[in-house]
Amino acid sequence: MNERVEVFGARRGLTGILTESDAAANANAPTILLTNVGIQTRVGPGRIWVELARRLAASGFPVLRFDLSGMGDSAVRSGGASESERAVLDMRDAMDHLGRKYGAKHFVVIGFCSGTDAAHGVALADPRVAGMIWVEGYAYRTRRFLVRWHMKRLLSLHRWRRYARSQLARLRLTAGQRRSLGEEDLIFTRDYPTRELLSRQLEELLHRGVRILAVYSGADNITYGYSGQFFEMMPGAFRGRVDELFVPEADHLFTTPEHRRALVEQLAGWIEDRFGERPTLRTGT
């Protein structure tokens, strides 16, 4: 295994680790890009990105895991771009660097939780993206989800008791404390594209030949709750065109070693299955 530091981007402000196999790499293999998960560095939760990078490198896929600008070891990017715009610029800087230095032509981008925004944004912006994986990405409630969600709560005495306690506790809060709780909700809430917009964007990517995998854990019990929900929540015909993986026993960050190892194998296996040879992409309309 060969791992080395890469410094690149505007004013050489971005820092990452490139992982490759000591053996001759598959010249047709796309390069995999991994970035931050929330505020965590390029290591990923529980070092999952380190494990995935080494697992994929052993199969001939080069992997760059790097910190987006202003995070980890990467400098703040100057200019007036928004956070999402900066993330796309950072990802494209990584692709440009790997293309110039190593001849990389195609890429698979993986976004975990809020990292989905960067992966999805650069997939739309850059035709060099051949594959995209969301882990705990965009999710929307469906009618089936709501029926299941409400039935579980209506039939649970424990949940009724907890609800009663929470309401009593809230009544004891001052107006300022209640306002503070509302502000915290806003801070930790992400803006999702509408279902209709996301559906059109996915159609655009699929038309271009981009392979897509969406992974969800069972931890999101307020939005996503069953296998196949992806295909019911989107106003488009994506079954058989987008791959979905639902892991009901895992938590949001796949914290336990067995769940993390299983996810690494599932992601690596999907990439091996879909990108054993050079991807064919359509750049026209």
Model-identified regions with their sequence ranges:
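Short glycine-enriched nucleophile-adjacent loop
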Residues: 111, 116-127, 132
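Active-site nucleophile loop of the alpha/beta-hydrolase fold
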Residues: 112-114, 133-144
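Alpha/beta-hydrolase active-site loop
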Residues: 80-101
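Serine-hydrolase catalytic core
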Residues: 8-9, 50-52, 151-284
